Design a protein with these regions (language model features):
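N-terminal beta-propeller domains
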Residues: 1-100, 187-214, 268-350
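Repeated scaffold domains used in trafficking and secretory/extracellular systems
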Residues: 58-65, 221-227, 264-274, 329-332, ...
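Active-site-adjacent structural elements in enzyme catalytic domains
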Residues: 230-231, 240, 251-252, 264-266, ...
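Hydrophobic or amphipathic alpha-helical targeting/insertion segments
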Residues: 234-246
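Surface-exposed loop/turn elements that mediate protein-protein interactions on large endomembrane-trafficking
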Residues: 247-255, 292-319, 352-359, 394-406
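Beta-sheet-dominated scaffold domains
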Residues: 327-424
Length: 424
């Protein structure tokens, strides 16, 4: 019997029925497979990162790798709870510090219980935040509990008291002990998943009673996300709707990321470095730099050239700001050939360097082609590809909707509440 060479088409087709796809010799399902030169090829597996003995706390939302000027390789990881640096096989916690307080006898222990109450006036902490206690000695033991450690805050009692949990029970009971202690608070953790908001301002004025949660909502509270980039050899990290921080590579892995300072915007959706012109962009940021209440989801700022601290425009610098008109908020951005591509939830825009006095200008490149999530776009050799709310798109000078044989399979089972967690 004559043998026939069966040639199958690359990719997976979930738009047609298995019977119809089979007629055209198309695959209808796959797992751990990629297509190379038109043929399926297995993934070659993965390994632990960094290793099984080290724990990454939280859900990783963004990663970024780079090489320092002295040749060291780094990988930054941003989770909903921490910010890390991986160098070699070692993982370092570089989560920024929110506040440092000097306390006196703040600990109250209960015999045979691992729960400790900490007193700190106007602590400003939330459940899930991390705090580290030090007292200048090798160890600070009270009733068998070693307090010179990092702890997760498990309960907020009130504005002046919270609770932490040790790994074992206290051997005694003390009301107000520990001596002179320094409490170092890391920045407030973010939510691990997106949820709907049901509080004040969700529905129309006067609906329901004061202090009562609303029964429905169209307001989404996004999960914590990060944007990570390089300014030279240093790391720039922005927490979604939070602050922007710098980790100085030359200071070493024993140091933490720090705020850009009092002159930088206090809240932004994300950041991006223009590698060609050496400006730092902050998108969805504050119209008044020091006031988080003025955060505008369509407004963006760029720093002076070669500066992370100069944000106020003057006649002698290149700092400035612009506002995008189409859409309700800026979702994401990537650097491309000769421009920065910026997406709102409705449209695509190009930002180009135009020189003095305006520094940068913008023009709209497409409408009804918004981005679904912060990390759902990529640029490859000047061509951009992204996932929208209803389809996949590309831009090569013109916005095009991409044909996709798995489109219904993807979108029919999509949780739009958690769409900002998507990464492509």
């Amino acid at each position: 019997m004559k043998l026939t060479d069966l040639k199958f088409q690359p990719g997976v087709d979930k738009q047609d029925s298995p019977y119809a796809a089979g007629d055209d010799r198309r695959y209808v399902d796959s797992q751990l497979v990629r297509f190379h030169y038109g043929k399926p090829e297995r993934w070659k597996g993965w390994s632990y990162l960094p290793n099984p003995n080290q724990t990454v706390i939280g859900v990783v939302r963004d990663t970024h790798s780079w090489v320092s000027l002295d040749g060291n390789r780094y990988l930054a990881l941003g989770t909903d709870r921490k910010l890390y640096i991986l160098e070699g096989s070692a993982l370092y916690d570089i989560t920024p510090i929110r506040a440092t307080e000097s306390l006196t006898n703040p600990f109250t222990t209960v015999s045979s219980s691992p729960i400790v109450t900490v007193t700190d006036s106007s602590h400003g902490a939330s459940v899930g935040d991390f705090v580290t206690f030090t007292d200048g000695t090798t160890n600070n033991v009270l009733d068998g509990i070693e307090f010179n450690n990092e702890f997760e805050i498990t309960t907020i009692v009130d504005a002046n008291n919270y609770k932490i949990t040790y790994s074992s029970n206290a051997t005694g009971a003390t009301a107000g002990g520990g001596g002179s202690v320094t409490a170092t608070y890391q920045i407030t953790v973010g939510p691990s998943t997106s949820t709907y908001g049901y509080g004040w301002g969700v529905l129309t004025w006067g609906l329901s009673t004061w202090g009562t949660a609303r029964s429905s909502s169209s307001i989404t509270l996004d999960a914590r996300n990060w944007s990570l980039d390089n300014f030279g050899e240093d790391l720039i990290a922005t927490a979604l709707n939070g602050g922007t921080y710098q980790w100085d590579t030359s200071s070493g892995t024993g140091t933490r990321a720090v705020s850009l300072g009092a002159t930088a915007p206090v809240a932004s959706r994300f950041s991006l470095v223009s590698s060609d012109t050496r400006h730092l962009f902050l998108f969805g940021t504050c119209t008044t730099v020091t006031d988080a209440a003025t955060q505008d989801d369509l407004f963006f700022r760029f720093s002076d050239r070669e500066s992370l601290t100069q944000w106020a425009p003057t006649a002698e610098n290149e700092a400035g700001s612009l506002r995008i008109a189409d859409g309700s908020r800026i979702i994401g951005a990537v650097t491309s050939t000769g421009q920065i591509l910026v997406w709102t939830d409705q449209s695509l825009h190009g930002i180009q360097f135009v020189g003095t006095p305006f520094t940068f200008g913008q023009r709209q490149l497409g409408a009804n082609c918004g981005l679904i999530a912060q990390h759902a776009a990529v640029d490859v050799n000047g061509q951009a590809f992204w996932m929208g709310d209803d389809a996949f798109y590309m831009y090569d000078g013109v916005v095009k909707k991409m044909p996709c044989s798995v489109q219904d399979y993807v979108y029919d089972d999509l949780s739009y509440t958690n769409k900002n967690d998507i990464a492509c």
